[in-house]
Amino acid sequence: KRDYAILVLTIHTGLRSCDVRCLRHKDIDWGKKTMHIIQGKTGEPVDLPLSDTAGWAIIDYLKNGRPKTSSDRIFVRHSSPHGPLGSTATMDTVLTKYILKAGIIVKSGEHYGMHSLRKTLATNMLVSGTALPVITQTLGHQDPKSTELYLSTDIQGLKQCALDPDEEYGEASV
């Protein structure tokens, strides 16, 4: 339940691993369905919507999966002592576990850590027509140029979408 909540929250919000690990109960306004966090990387505050899917995943974890602990962090270790999660590597291990379970083959040199979920969110937002300033704000970037790095074009994906003009329109007569 914890891993599911972590992955869903990351996919829906684009939070950095450090911000997911440090998320506290007081950071979530359940009535407004929002989160207010101070970003670990930049120290800047960011307000984000909390989707129903992510919210229910967190609630399910809190009610049915989280060990009893005095920690104010949402996500805690499940082995004793039940304190805050460790490093970003711990978060990457969560994702890696499910990549392997799903039988997904990651090519040598490909990056697939938790940070890749931020890029996926940014790309999906762009594809759905979300404006760059909104994507920038969602990712907690100060400079839109930082966001643009997340939106690099996937040449292989474009090649798969390309049409063969000869196939579509017949041989061109010159």
List where the protein language model places each region.
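Conserved catalytic core of the tyrosine transesterase superfamily
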Residues: 1-174
